Amino acid sequence: MKGYSMSVDENNARARIVEADISLKDAVNIAHHIRGMKLDYAKQILEDVVSKKYAIPYFRYLDSVSHRPGKGPGRYPVKAAKVFIDLLSNVENNAEFKGMNTDSLIIKHVAANKGRMIKKYTPKAYGRAGANFKDLINLEVIVTEGDQ
């Protein structure tokens, strides 16, 4: 399947967001946290992250990440959580279009990868130029029907 890191069969639904302007570090930690969850529960967690009621526990990029009560190091990545909510809504609509039961969907695969880099240069004094690079992020999710 072009563009996806794993192949899917007919009883799976998939969705992608290409070149999202979010932090790679936040996206990797959110993807790790929601992998294997039921789709409705993952969407509820991400909505709680947006309202800053639930902290995403960080497993990677932990330098100077503060401890959260009962979870260890974590943060509230609001901007990335909004993009993941859109991604999960897209895959839910795709599953509904394929005739799958949307109440029993389980996140089988979710990944966040580096996309294209936007290169900007800011003029500085004495003819120099300062680099201002930004990485864009590619997200993908695959869901399957689970047992009820």
From Swiss-Prot:
Q: Is the keyword Ribonucleoprotein in the record?
A: yes
Which InterPro entries does this entry report, sorted A to Z?
A: Ribosomal_uL22, Ribosomal_uL22_euk/arc, Ribosomal_uL22_sf
Gene Ontology cellular component list: cytosolic large ribosomal subunit
Q: Which GO terms describe its biological process?
A: cytoplasmic translation
- What does the UniProt keyword field contain? Ribonucleoprotein, Ribosomal protein, RNA-binding, rRNA-binding
> Which Pfam family, any one of them, does this sequence belong to?
Ribosomal_L22
Is Ribonucleoprotein found in the keyword set? yes
Question: What molecular function terms (GO) are annotated for this protein?
Answer: rRNA binding; structural constituent of ribosome
Give the family, as the similarity comment puts it: Belongs to the universal ribosomal protein uL22 family.
Q: What does this protein do?
A: This protein binds specifically to 23S rRNA. It makes multiple contacts with different domains of the 23S rRNA in the assembled 50S subunit and ribosome. The globular domain of the protein is located near the polypeptide exit tunnel on the outside of the subunit, while an extended beta-hairpin is found that lines the wall of the exit tunnel in the center of the 70S ribosome.
Subunit structure, per the record? Part of the 50S ribosomal subunit.
User: What name goes with this protein?
Assistant: Large ribosomal subunit protein uL22
